[in-house]
């Protein structure tokens, strides 16, 4: 497909989300959290849209989590996960409404996330934030989070996150779904091929910013502490296990919480062991920020 055909298909997918995307409890935190709408224009990117979510009762400057949603780089998602995290961990959560593929493709989403984090750190007082942050991503958002973290190490133009949170991340865009070891229905395989075509345009799909699971341990020697959430029924399970072992070999402090009966997207889509997984993340965020105070 050419870019026009990719866009038409992506717009149709966005207009017809699966029923399970309509998660329960969307407004359950309306009274105990606040959601601020923000826009900035910096660098060569278009205007960046993001939300800052914080506990409604909290008035002091807060450390913050930057959360990058999943959706194959082509879908928008709601901010319920971010609201739960902010409320439970007594922190601010910045949810970036990154520009979607195929209109915007690699490395655009990485660039704008890096720009936003630098902006928040340099203007922390304006946003009532502290200058320490955690980076979080689910599925394709985990891919972006890995890439931004790698840049913070390699280019030294961004403060490294205090913690990296990865949930069932898409970490190998090089290997065709037919050649991956995990069970995956043919329809899902076609979806992953489509997502890749939307996100990449004349790019080597084997580089660390695109397929971190295939990179050697030397790439990750200065990686921050990392917490990984993975499901035993996730079609991306093996590439997440591979990155986990690579981080171990690199000497990174890394922990994986594995839920055998959970599938891809379970934590945000509120399936299987989602409550346990979210609680683990909430507790870890609280722990890390308390150490950095």
Locate predicted features.
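Alpha/beta-hydrolase superfamily serine-hydrolase fold, recognizing
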Residues: 6, 27, 34-293
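An N-terminal hydrophobic leader/cap segment in hydrolases
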Residues: 1-40
